[in-house]
UniProtKB/Swiss-Prot annotation:
Residue ranges of domain F-box in the record: 18-64
PROSITE patterns listed in its UniProt record: FBOX (PS50181)
Residue stretches making up the FBD domain: 354-406
Protein name in the entry: F-box/FBD/LRR-repeat protein At1g51370
CDD domains: F-box_AtFBL13-like (cd22160)
SMART domains named in the record: FBD (SM00579), FBOX (SM00256)
Sorted UniProt keywords: Leucine-rich repeat, Repeat
Length: 435
């Protein structure tokens, strides 16, 4: 010891620093625990005597009973939770019942949640689980997500705070049930209908003055009356499943079209979709969809999407040669996100052909407007990758940022970076980021 000063033990210092979270106010700790699953939240009771009962104050229940074999324990725990929150509010209830749905009294649990000012309700049940009528008049509900549930037909719907409605594989007794839910949600902003079992042959008449985002798939046909709609995501097989009836049009369109019909039917669908695309500023498109458009336009004048400024495209490697044509169709493009994926059919048939993206002419957007490009992939490096990077850097006059979201081993990355820095840049202000 020097100068009579006692050295602080490293373990004491580390222990003190690690326990800083315990010094936080209990309401803040409760908020932190709220964002964990209930299982992880309960585990914190073993940290210290202070933490022993903190999890009980969390205003939410996030359980996966499907992963547990002890039904009685789960039932007792859930009922105890509702009893302890009898006079308080519950912000979140998430239950993943799965195939064990018949072992739990789901209707009484949802009824209990609605009387405790529930805000977020997320229930994954199974085919014959009916949702109680109390859900239709829950005045505090903000976010409703149901999977594999069966809705009953309500006489009255009042959901004054509901902003997000997310239904997956949900069954309806008739075509008016979903319409009542939408019309009874005066502040609804987001609607997701995935594999929705809507009565066959019926078209959903969707009317909402507040809806901003809509996500539908091939199992439902929709006529949309939504003047504030900003983003429409639609997946289609053979036929177009939406029609927009309003003075405006969504700024963003996310289209996935897979053709399984005849030639005439396909031609009509493509023409309808192209009219819609010509009106948007932000487009998300899959490789299958663009390939259908590409083949359709071969004997026709070049497609022109004069309003598109943001493009997010997902391409199979074997279809990358279509990229220049797509860029030529977007003369005012400012932002491009391009994701490369492996073509499953190519892998299956052992085809090794790599595409060539080099063309004799440069698309107008590269010369005049393209400022941001992101290239990403979830596959091993492909043979034409560096040629694609070179194509962008050497032809983009006003490019400000090129982001390369790719994975390399340490050795391969060094070689990639060496080759990258040697590529001349048409834009002197371009910054290249390798993630």
């Amino acid at each position: 010891m020097v100068g009579g000063k006692k050295k602080t033990k490293i373990c004491d210092k580390v222990s003190h620093e690690e326990d800083r979270i315990s010094q936080l106010p209990e309401p803040l700790i409760s908020e932190i625990l709220f964002h964990l699953s209930t299982k992880d939240s309960v585990r914190t009771s073993a940290l210290s005597t202070k933490w022993r009962y903190l999890w009980q104050s969390v205003p939410g229940l996030d359980l996966d009973p499907y992963a547990s074999s002890n039904t009685n324990t789960i039932v007792s725990f859930v009922e105890s939770f509702f009893d302890s929150h009898r006079d308080s509010w519950i912000r979140k209830l998430r239950l993943d019942l799965g195939y064990h749905h018949d072992k739990y009294d789901l209707m009484s649990w949802i009824d209990a949640a609605t009387t405790r000012r529930i805000q977020h309700l997320d229930v994954h049940c199974f085919h014959d689980n009916k949702i109680p009528l109390s859900i239709y008049t829950c005045t505090t509900l903000v976010h409703l997500r149901l999977r594999w549930a069966v809705l009953t037909n309500p006489e009255f719907v009042s959901l004054p705070c509901l902003k997000i409605m997310h239904f997956e594989n949900v069954s309806y007794p008739n075509e008016t049930t979903l319409q009542k839910l939408i019309s009874g949600s005066p502040v609804l902003e987001e609607l997701i209908l995935f594999s929705t079992m809507y009565p066959k042959g019926n078209v959903l008449q969707l009317r909402s003055d507040t809806l901003k985002r809509l996500d539908i798939n091939e199992f439902i046909d929709v006529v949309i009356y939504a003047p504030l709609l900003q983003c429409l995501r639609a997946k289609m097989y053979s036929t177009k499943n939406f029609q927009i009836i309003s003075s405006g049009f969504p700024a963003k369109l996310d289209i996935d079209f897979v053709n399984t019909g005849g030639r005439y039917q396909k031609k009509k669908v493509i023409e309808d979709i192209l009219i819609d695309i010509s009106r948007v500023r932000d487009l998300v498109i899959s490789s299958n969809t663009w390939k259908e458009f590409f083949l359709y336009s071969k004997s026709r004048p070049l497609l022109q999407f004069r309003y598109i400024s943001h493009l997010n495209a997902r391409f199979y490697i074997s279809d990358l040669e279509m990229l220049p044509t797509l860029l030529e169709s977007c003369p005012k493009l400012e932002s491009l996100i391009l994701e490369m994926v492996k073509n499953q059919s190519t892998r299956r048939h052992g085809e090794k052909r790599e595409p060539n993206v080099m063309v004799s002419t440069v698309p107008w957007c590269l010369v005049s407007s393209l400022k941001f490009v992101e290239l990403k992939r979830s596959i091993p490096r492909y043979e034409g990758e560096m040629e694609l990077v070179r194509y962008v850097l050497t032809n983009s006059t006003v490019l400000k940022k090129l982001r390369l979201n790719v994975y390399y081993t340490k050795k391969a990355k060094c070689a990639f970076l060496t080759e990258l820095v040697a590529i001349p840049r048409c834009s002197s202000t371009c910054v290249v980021l390798v993630l």
